[in-house]
Regions:
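Non-cytosolic beta-sheet module surface loops
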Residues: 56-58, 101
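Non-catalytic surface loops within mature trypsin-like serine protease
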Residues: 29, 58, 70, 89-91, ...
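N-terminal post-signal-peptidase region of extra-cytosolic proteins
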Residues: 34-43, 68-71, 80, 84
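Sec-dependent N-terminal signal peptides
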Residues: 4-13
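Residues within well-ordered beta-strands of beta-sheet-rich folds
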Residues: 53-55, 86
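Histidine- and aromatic-enriched segments that form or immediately flank copper-ligand environments
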Residues: 59-81, 109
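Extracellular/periplasmic metallocenter environments
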Residues: 18-19, 23-24, 77-114
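N-terminal edge beta-strand
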Residues: 20-51
Length: 114
């Protein structure tokens, strides 16, 4: 199976295409009164049947989770560490991405197209 050339979307800029291979995501601190943290980019796009490889980079001190429940993805990335996640996007739809450790402040979505 081929590794998807994922398109990453930053809402204000619209879709952009990434080179074929692994996609890097990082946890970032958004300065707000609630000290919100998000995975960036928050949206990941794939096609049904594609193999997806995500590189999760946590440059913050605290551990953070990364969960896409619909695909059995559930990782904890320790502070200052990196983890790789691989799965097959075997169903189409929009699926929530959250931090299972801090669900109130880390959200995103995986969009799998037919």
């Amino acid at each position: 199976m081929r590794v998807l050339a994922l398109a990453l979307v930053i809402v204000a800029l619209g879709p952009t295409t990434a080179p074929t291979g692994e996609i890097s995501l990082r946890i970032v601190n958004v300065i707000t009164p609630q000290d919100v943290k998000i995975w960036e980019p928050p949206s990941v796009f794939a096609k049904k049947g594609d193999s997806v490889a995500l590189k999760l980079i946590n440059r913050l001190d605290a551990e953070h989770g990364y969960e896409i429940a619909a695909f059995g993805v559930k990782e904890v990335v320790d502070g200052g560490k990196t983890k790789e996640v691989k799965f097959t996007a075997d169903k189409a739809g929009v699926f929530p991405i959250k931090c299972q450790l801090h669900p109130a402040h880390v959200v995103g979505q995986l969009v799998v197209l037919e």
